[in-house]
């Protein structure tokens, strides 16, 4: 069953294949059969030789199977080119279009003009019939709005601008003057040069710029006015497009102005090369095969055959139009054939044949011609197609060139001016600017005039400039020998690239402002200022080698330590001070308790010495703790017990550590250097973190601003600081000094100068974005190399180092700052004012306490006087009583004595008279206080120790008056005194025989 099914399906499968393939073959056969088999090629030629060669070429083409498919035949239809363009139009219609030509090959005599070829192009283009020109080189044929179907195997004249660029690159000329006629071709070659140079120099370091464009009317009679302008320009390289007749006038007048001699370079196009007065040494271009009509005819025919062959294989070609009277004819195949023609790239007799979008020949070869004596033309180079690289290549033999003035050495191509227009800008310490007074007529010897020109009213304000860059300029002008006029930047800016409305235009375009704009627009020759070298600026201007290497850094104000009245307390934290204060009183309390409860402290043993030291009370313990802490000596009692004394020793060690730590920390905190910066550098987290309350800024539009824009990792920081940016560096630095701006990011040279001038300012962190300051010059300036070499010599000789010391590091000011930094900081009144205030408070407290004590003492004295009066009265009364008692007792004893005597001896008489000589004491009249013999003061001093119960009596006084106690202040032991009552004293006598009762 499977085999039967397969056998049944095979016919169906084969039928399907046939049905699918048949339409394709039918379509191919239909296409091939629908295309014409014969093609008429028209020719509008200038002479019979060209007509004959055209016919021969067509015949040979039919046998070339590489270009002609089978069953396809080409036929030629030719007419003679008429000088009358109208007649030419009729001939094209009647003899070419009527014969259904598919394309037309056109040539004409060079002297007949381009009107007839243009007529052929207009007529054929109206019917979309392609036209291939072999001799028309005017720029007008490149306009596809007019010549819609025109191609040519020769390049237009303005394509020589491409060769000019190659020659300038070969000779390394960077500045040129272009001379061209004001016709279509002259303006076309200028436009081609400017347009092509934009892309040509993308990969070339040295760019040729047009210094001056001189446009003249064709058929001129004199070129003198233009030569005057050319002579004042720097460039001595002239690129000229002119007809042969105009070139004769230009060369004639240039010779009279001596502008065709030594040092000048003339590069001209083909027409000017054939002038009969072309100076010796002129270089010109000559198109290869320019006059080879036969070669161009053959190449045009084969290009056409190649296009038709490809078109036949791809699509159907409709028959060409036949009637010029039918204006409704729209031959689409003709338009398609024109596109196929433009895409051709073949190797022909005239070289590599290819076309651009305008149908103009590309890859055309040129000979570089050098004019010698007697108008001899010598080929010194070729501009030809390199098949290996598939591009054009310039080859010039420099040794064979004879330059103007019969020189073998290549001219510099530029006249180096010796008087330059210089610009600068105020930027301390590089440029100081001072306005001249009304009575001043000249600047100081170390200054140079630098007026500020007002662009609005063309007035000038007189200023004088001095500084680092001015000294450099003075030395530079001497070294490389130039004079100058110095002026200030008109807008006071270095310049940045901004969008701006063009004059008279509605569109925005980018342009440079400030110093850079003046240089780019060639209103200045040189910029002598602290101009940072960066890629954005180097694209538009030249820089010398750096005269000052620097980078970017951060300026901030030095952090100042706030000095308060309690600065002396800052070495310890508040918590530590509180703990110390608490510890003093806790230790005092523990000392008191240990001494009180110790068996060897408060309580004395019964057999202990009466002179043993007393135990420590609470007030003495507090005094002891403070005395040890403050190391003031201890004048009060010390701990008596062993346990309290151990604690006292530990407390003394604690006090020693605390005092030593305080002293050391005070020295470190107040005497050592303060921290120099708050920021560690550009990578400081506070700069990168936009949430921090830290303001930083730079100068808007400056090189530093451009640096931050380039750095992706600094984009967040730049967005934050962009709103704070300043117009000038001076404003930002002032705000840093005032504390309004915390960090100013700018060139290190300027900030180092500010830091050396003001000891309160400091640069933070390391340099970043390293670059250098260079002298700016115009692109291609002849002074670039000379300035660079001079600056290198200045570095080697030490001149730049001298300028650094003189201007940037600010001489003695920097030394003073260094001295300030090296000198140890000393404590001042700000730091220690609190200590003096503390002493003052202590003095005031002492005075207050003494006043209180005096008042209290007066009150006590009054009270004591009352007590003394009462005591005196009591003592007087007591003395009287004692006296009476004594007398009575004496009488009684006398009586007893007499009784005894009477009983033993004979009775006698006792005289009561007083013997004053024998008993002087008894002869004195005694008051109550002198009832006892002796001095009253001694009597009272002896009696007071027994008056312990009396109010107001000091225990210390009582203790001091005890027998055996040390005498006050002398440390001596008082002698033992009798404490017997007066009646038992030695002054008392039992002899009372002298008393009379």
Curated annotation (Swiss-Prot):
Main location: membrane
Biological process according to GO: behavioral response to ethanol; calcium ion homeostasis; chemical synaptic transmission; ionotropic glutamate receptor signaling pathway; long-term memory; medium-term memory; olfactory learning; phototaxis
Gene3D superfamilies: 1.10.287.70, 3.40.50.2300, Periplasmic binding protein-like II
Signal peptide extent: 1-26
Cytoplasmic compartment segments: 595-651, 853-997
Subcellular location: Cell membrane; Postsynaptic cell membrane; Postsynaptic density
Keyword GTP-binding annotated: no
Matches recorded under SUPFAM superfamilies: Periplasmic binding protein-like I, Periplasmic binding protein-like II, Voltage-gated potassium channels
Claim: Transmembrane helix is one of the keywords in the record: yes
Glycosylation site residues: 258, 314, 345, 397, 454, 481, 501, 693
Segments on the Extracellular side according to the record's topology features: 27-573, 673-831
GO molecular function: glutamate-gated receptor activity; NMDA glutamate receptor activity
SMART domains: Lig_chan-Glu_bd (SM00918), PBPe (SM00079)
Positions bound to glycine: 530-532, 537, 703, 747
Region feature Disordered, mapped onto this chain: 970-997
Keywords: Calcium, Cell membrane, Disulfide bond, Glycoprotein, Ion channel, Ion transport, Ligand-gated ion channel, Magnesium, Membrane, Phosphoprotein, Postsynaptic cell membrane, Receptor, Signal, Synapse, Transmembrane, Transmembrane helix, Transport
Cited Pfam families: ANF_receptor, CaM_bdg_C0, Lig_chan, Lig_chan-Glu_bd
Self-association and partners: Forms a heteromeric NMDA channel with Nmdar2.
Family note: Belongs to the glutamate-gated ion channel (TC 1.A.10.1) family.
Function as written in the Swiss-Prot or TrEMBL entry: NMDA receptor subtype of glutamate-gated ion channels with high calcium permeability and voltage-dependent sensitivity to magnesium. Mediated by glycine. This protein plays a key role in synaptic plasticity, synaptogenesis, excitotoxicity, memory acquisition and learning. It mediates neuronal functions in glutamate neurotransmission. Is involved in the cell surface targeting of NMDA receptors. Plays a role in associative learning and in long-term memory consolidation.
Protein name per its UniProtKB record: Glutamate [NMDA] receptor subunit 1
Organism: Drosophila sechellia (Fruit fly)
Higher taxonomy: Eukaryota, Metazoa, Ecdysozoa, Arthropoda, Hexapoda
């Amino acid at each position: 069953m499977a085999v039967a099914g397969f056998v049944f399906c095979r016919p169906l499968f084969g039928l399907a294949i046939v049905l699918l393939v048949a339409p394709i073959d039918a379509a191919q056969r239909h296409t091939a059969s629908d295309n014409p088999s014969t093609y008429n090629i028209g020719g509008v030629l200038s002479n019979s030789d060209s007509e004959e060669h055209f016919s021969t070429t067509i015949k040979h083409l039919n046998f070339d199977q590489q270009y002609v498919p089978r069953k396809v035949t080409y036929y030629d239809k030719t007419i003679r080119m008429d000088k009358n363009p109208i007649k030419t139009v009729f001939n094209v219609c009647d003899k070419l279009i009527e014969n259904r030509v598919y394309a037309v090959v056109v040539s004409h005599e060079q002297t007949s003009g381009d009107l007839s070829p243009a007529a052929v192009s207009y007529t054929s283009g109206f019917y979309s019939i392609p036209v291939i020109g072999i001799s028309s080189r005017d720029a007008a044929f490149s306009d596809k709005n007019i010549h819609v179907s025109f191609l040519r195997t020769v390049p237009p004249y303005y394509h020589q601008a491409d060769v000019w660029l190659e020659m300038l690159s070969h000779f390394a000329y960077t500045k040129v003057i272009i001379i061209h006629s004001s016709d279509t071709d002259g303006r076309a070659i200028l436009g081609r040069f400017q347009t092509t140079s934009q892309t040509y120099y993308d990969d070339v370091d040295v760019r040729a710029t047009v210094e001056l464009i001189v446009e003249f009317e064709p058929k001129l009679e004199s070129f003198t006015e233009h030569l005057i302008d050319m002579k004042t320009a720097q460039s001595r390289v002239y690129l000229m497009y002119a007809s042969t007749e105009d070139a004769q006038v230009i060369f004639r007048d240039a010779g009279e102005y001596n502008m065709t001699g030594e040092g000048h370079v003339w590069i001209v196009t083909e027409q000017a090369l054939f002038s009969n007065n072309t100076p010796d040494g002129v270089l010109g271009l000559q198109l290869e095969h320019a006059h080879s009509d036969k070669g161009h005819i053959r190449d045009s025919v084969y290009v056409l055959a190649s296009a038709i062959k490809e078109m036949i294989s791809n699509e159907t070609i409709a028959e060409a139009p036949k009637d010029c009277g039918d204006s409704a004819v729209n031959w689409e195949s003709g338009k398609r054939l024109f596109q196929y023609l433009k895409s051709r790239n073949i190797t022909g007799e005239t070289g590599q044949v290819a076309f651009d979008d305008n149908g103009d020949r590309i890859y055309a070869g040129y000979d570089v011609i050098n004019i010698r004596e007697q108008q001899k033309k010598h080929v010194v180079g070729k501009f030809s197609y390199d098949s290996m690289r598939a591009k054009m290549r310039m080859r010039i033999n420099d040794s064979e060139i004879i330059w103007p003035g019969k020189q073998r050495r290549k001219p510099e191509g530029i006249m180096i001016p010796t008087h330059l227009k210089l610009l600068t800008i105020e930027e301390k310490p590089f440029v100081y600017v001072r306005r001249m007074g009304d009575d001043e007529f000249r600047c100081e010897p170390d200054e140079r005039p630098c007026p500020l020109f007002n662009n609005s009213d063309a007035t000038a304000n007189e200023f004088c400039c001095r500084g680092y860059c001015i000294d450099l300029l003075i030395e530079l002008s001497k070294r490389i020998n130039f004079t100058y006029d110095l002026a200030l930047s008109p807008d006071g800016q270095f310049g940045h690239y901004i969008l701006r409305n063009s004059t008279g235009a509605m569109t925005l375009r980018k342009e440079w402002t400030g110093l850079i704009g003046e240089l780019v627009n060639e209103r200045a020759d040189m910029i002598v200022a602290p101009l940072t070298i960066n890629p954005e600026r180097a694209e538009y201007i030249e820089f010398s080698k750096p005269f000052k290497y620097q980078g970017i850094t951060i300026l901030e104000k030095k952090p100042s330590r706030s000095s308060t009245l309690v600065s002396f307390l800052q070495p310890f934290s508040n918590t530590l001070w509180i703990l110390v204060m608490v510890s003093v009183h806790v230790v005092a309390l523990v000392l008191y308790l240990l001494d009180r409860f110790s068996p060897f402290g408060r309580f004395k043993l019964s057999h202990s010495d009466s002179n043993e030291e007393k135990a420590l009370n609470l007030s003495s313990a507090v005094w002891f703790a403070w005395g040890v802490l403050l190391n003031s000596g201890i004048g009060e009692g010390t701990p008596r017990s062993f346990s309290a004394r151990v604690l006292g020793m530990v407390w003394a060690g604690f006090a020693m550590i605390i005092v030593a730590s305080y002293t050391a920390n005070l020295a470190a905190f107040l005497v050592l250097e303060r921290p120099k910066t708050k920021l560690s550098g550009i990578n400081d987290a506070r700069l990168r973190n936009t949430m921090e309350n830290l303001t930083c800024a730079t100068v808007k539009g400056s090189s530093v601003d451009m640096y931050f824009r380039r750095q992706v990792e600094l984009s967040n920081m730049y967005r934050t600081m962009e709103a704070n940016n300043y117009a000038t560096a001076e404003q930002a630095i002032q705000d840093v000094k005032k504390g309004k701006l915390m960090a100013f990011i700018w060139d290190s040279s300027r900030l180092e100068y500010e830091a050396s001038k003001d000891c309160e300012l400091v640069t933070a962190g390391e340099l970043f974005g390293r670059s250098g300051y260079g002298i700016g010059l115009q692109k291609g300036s002849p002074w670039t190399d000379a300035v660079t070499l001079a600056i290198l010599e200045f570095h080697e000789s030490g001149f730049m180092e001298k300028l650094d010391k003189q201007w940037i590091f600010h001489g003695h000011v920097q030394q003073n700052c260094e001295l300030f930094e090296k000198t140890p900081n000393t404590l001042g009144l700000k730091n220690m004012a609190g200590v003096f205030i503390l002493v003052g408070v202590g003095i005031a407290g002492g005075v207050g306490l003494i006043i209180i004590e005096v008042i209290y003492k007066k009150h006590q004295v009054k009270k004591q006087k009352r007590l003394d009066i009462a005591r005196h009265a009591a003592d007087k009364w007591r003395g009287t009583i004692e006296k009476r008692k004594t007398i009575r007792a004496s009488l009684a004893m006398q009586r007893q004595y007499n009784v005894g005597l009477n009983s033993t001896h004979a009775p006698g008489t006792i005289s009561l008279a007083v013997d004053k000589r024998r008993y002087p004491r008894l002869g004195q009249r005694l008051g109550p206080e002198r009832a006892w013999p002796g001095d009253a003061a001694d009597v009272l001093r002896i009696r007071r120790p027994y008056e312990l119960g009396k109010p107001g009596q000091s225990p210390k006084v009582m203790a001091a008056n005890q027998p055996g106690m040390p005498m006050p202040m002398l440390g001596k032991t008082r002698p033992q005194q009798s404490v017997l009552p007066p009646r038992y004293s030695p002054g008392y006598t039992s002899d009372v025989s002298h008393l009379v009762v």
